[in-house]
């Protein structure tokens, strides 16, 4: 006969953590889709440099509005979680701090690694009569850098997910 007085360990509340992990994964996927789907379509369907530059500039414009905002939101959520856990002496707060730092790493990567290429593409988009080969080469270079940048939020999500698994007692390292 089963006892009705069995004691269960309390289920950890991980709603904020799950939201941060999901946002980071969504951000990474949205960013990666530009490199894996959108830019190849644009490259394969344009035979005029000026049109290609116009499309890239619009893609950059809308991406610049959405992606940094998602990165800041995700990082802020990770920072809040890390701070809250550290304030009460929770030993696994650093997993969320690392997840946030990894996610926001897209900003310095953009400013140090990608900005020269971004600036060149923007400068070319304001002129006419550009070489298709040069523009395609710059956009392919941009795609590779953007692909690398897209991985940062995914690594952040993995680190955050490990933190969630630790809290739930599923992962012990």
Swiss-Prot record:
Its main location: membrane. Glycans are attached at residue 118. Pathway: Secondary metabolite biosynthesis. Induction: Expression is positively regulated by the cluster-specific transcription factor MYCFIDRAFT_198930 and is up-regulated during banana leaves infection. Keywords: Glycoprotein, Membrane, Monooxygenase, Oxidoreductase, Transmembrane, Transmembrane helix. Its EC number is 1.10.3.-. GO terms for cellular component: membrane. It is found in: Membrane. One of its GO terms (molecular function) is monooxygenase activity. The chain crosses the membrane at residues 23-43, 62-82, 93-113, 138-158. It holds the Pfam family Anthrone_oxy. It catalyses: emodin anthrone + O2 = emodin + H2O + H(+). It is a multi-pass membrane protein. Anthrone oxygenase; part of the gene cluster that mediates the biosynthesis of an emodin derivative that may be involved in black Sigatoka disease of banana. The pathway begins with the synthesis of atrochrysone thioester by the polyketide synthase PKS8-1. The atrochrysone carboxyl ACP thioesterase MYCFIDRAFT_190111 then breaks the thioester bond and releases the atrochrysone carboxylic acid from PKS8-1. Belongs to the anthrone oxygenase family. This is Anthrone oxygenase MYCFIDRAFT_34418. It comes from Pseudocercospora fijiensis (strain CIRAD86) (Black leaf streak disease fungus). The lineage of its organism: Eukaryota, Fungi, Dikarya, Ascomycota, Pezizomycotina.
